[in-house]
Amino acid sequence: MIVKFCGFKTESDIKKIKKLEVDAVGFIHYPDSKRHVSLKQLKYLAKIVPDHIEKVVVVVNPQMSTIKRIINQTDINTIQLHGNESIQLIRNIKKLNSKIRIIKAIPATRNLNNNIQKYKDEIDMFIIDTPSITYGGTGQSFDWKLLKKIKGVDFLIAGGLDFEKIKRLEIYSFGQCGYDISTGIESHNEKDFNKMTRILKFLKGDE
């Protein structure tokens, strides 16, 4: 079960996950997000994440020049595309660095399957998130029944997840590879060590 914790902004929050069995840590590089980090911050924060943890940057409709700066100046090894990016952009990223993993976030709408078909041969994994004009980070869930239609691709579930919602999702057989959590691991706008630990213990089989 893959667990990705997202929306990290500070060194103190990074320190909280150093001894946890989290698979991936995400940083938001999108100025309209309340969790946005600058390229300078991204470079520093990614460097202090332990090497065994996947380092993900979340971008929305980025210019290729932005992607080049991220790849060339930081330790990021995965790019999460959260907008309406073109297939050509994805191919250009792969040409620039074939080792970079690409995650594509897809809003959970009636067009979910069409969007999956569009991108599935170009990317490494999907994240299914709540539809929003702000491209994620809403803290709101979506209709999980839409997940029943997904077949033959790897995906994480996102969208306002916390411990209780994850417990409910684990009852169903949607075929997800794991979860992407941000708001549900926070207290007072900081990452909450106890919330993160509780989720990891439950999903990694210790609880």
UniProtKB/Swiss-Prot annotation:
Catalyzed reactions per annotation: N-(5-phospho-beta-D-ribosyl)anthranilate = 1-(2-carboxyphenylamino)-1-deoxy-D-ribulose 5-phosphate
Annotated EC: 5.3.1.24
Pathways involved: Amino-acid biosynthesis; L-tryptophan biosynthesis; L-tryptophan from chorismate: step 3/5
InterPro entries: Aldolase_TIM (IPR013785), PRAI_dom (IPR001240), RibuloseP-bd_barrel (IPR011060), TrpF_fam (IPR044643)
Organism domain of life: Bacteria
Alphabetized SUPFAM superfamilies for the sequence: Ribulose-phoshate binding barrel
Keywords: Amino-acid biosynthesis, Aromatic amino acid biosynthesis, Isomerase, Tryptophan biosynthesis
GO biological-process terms attached to the record: L-tryptophan biosynthetic process
Chain segments annotated as transmembrane: none
GO molecular function, one term: phosphoribosylanthranilate isomerase activity
HAMAP family: PRAI
Classification via PANTHER family: N-(5'-PHOSPHORIBOSYL)ANTHRANILATE ISOMERASE
NCBIfam families reported in the protein's UniProt record: PRK13958.1
Family: Belongs to the TrpF family.
Entry protein name: N-(5'-phosphoribosyl)anthranilate isomerase
Organism lineage: Bacteria, Bacillati, Bacillota, Bacilli, Bacillales
